[in-house]
Amino acid sequence: MKTRKGIILAGGSGTRLYPVTMAVSKQLLPIYDKPMIYYPLSTLMLAGIRDILIISTPQDTPRFQQLLGDGSQWGLNLQYKVQPSPDGLAQAFIIGEEFIGNDDCALVLGDNIFYGHDLPKLMEAAVNKESGATVFAYHVNDPERYGVVEFDQSGTAVSLEEKPLQPKSNYAVTGLYFYDNSVVEMAKNLKPSARGELEITDINRIYMEQGRLSVAMMGRGYAWLDTGTHQSLIEASNFIATIEERQGLKVSCPEEIAYRKGFIDAEQIKNLAKPLSKNAYGQYLLNMIKGY
């Protein structure tokens, strides 16, 4: 099976969240009991991806390095690159060209939270795809705010529109994308849009025109949260808190995912829990390996 690498795009200036983000990256803000970046990182881990590039601003990159390190504590290989200015999501593949090499890749946006019991299974199909691209569609009641995808019964995209005034469907394209290696050359040949950015929608459109864009549907029972406003930060935190308090199980806990996937062992969990032992997070990790 081909190797697939992951990219987390955690740049941007977070102006919609000012003054909160004037001195700190949005993706370092807490969503209940974890930094926001843990959620997209966990999404890639659940897809079995262990080689991950984090792209951020010049000022925020050292902070992500301080928080996450080289990823070895979770059995990952984390690397970092700077995006000097926010010139569009598709720029991630140009910045990450060397990191991607000859492999396929997945891109997740640093402020997108995904939740759903079958999420790993849904992503597995995208990971195992030999060629082409997969995007994930989510039913929303305000599609005019998003990139909207229309698709046929076989799950093949037939139209893509960015924030359309008259949407052809209620399905928004989420911030999770799986591509084969040809995405790098596509990104390099893109022309900037009217707003001066290299648009991910244009990449998806090329795949669609080639008949190589698959749409995986996140149906009922899935949550997709985009945490770009003050209100959505609160809503996301409340959502995670409700699930965790009710079930006693954590959502998007990298230590737990690494352990359950066999990236790390019980001894390593013990070491990770030590500095956290005075709070519920550390206790959760220790309880997880009781009896081992």
From Swiss-Prot:
Gene: rmlA
Protein name: Glucose-1-phosphate thymidylyltransferase
Job of this protein: Catalyzes the formation of dTDP-glucose, from dTTP and glucose 1-phosphate, as well as its pyrophosphorolysis.
Cofactor or coenzyme needed: Mg(2+)
Organism this protein belongs to: Salmonella anatum
Catalytic activity: dTTP + alpha-D-glucose 1-phosphate + H(+) = dTDP-alpha-D-glucose + diphosphate
Known EC number: 2.7.7.24
GO molecular function: glucose-1-phosphate thymidylyltransferase activity; metal ion binding
Family membership noted in the UniProt record: Belongs to the glucose-1-phosphate thymidylyltransferase family.
Cofactor: binding details: Binds 1 Mg(2+) ion per subunit.
Source organism, top-level taxon: Bacteria
Transmembrane segment boundaries: none
Entries under Pfam families matching the protein: NTP_transferase
Record's keyword annotation contains Magnesium: yes
Pathway listed: Carbohydrate biosynthesis; dTDP-L-rhamnose biosynthesis; Bacterial outer membrane biogenesis; LPS O-antigen biosynthesis
Keyword Transferase among record annotations: yes
Signal sequence residues: none
NCBIfam families reported for this sequence: PRK15480.1, rmlA
Database matches in CDD domains: G1P_TT_short
Subunit structure: Homotetramer.
Binding site for Mg(2+): 111, 226
Keyword annotations of the record: Lipopolysaccharide biosynthesis, Magnesium, Metal-binding, Nucleotidyltransferase, Transferase
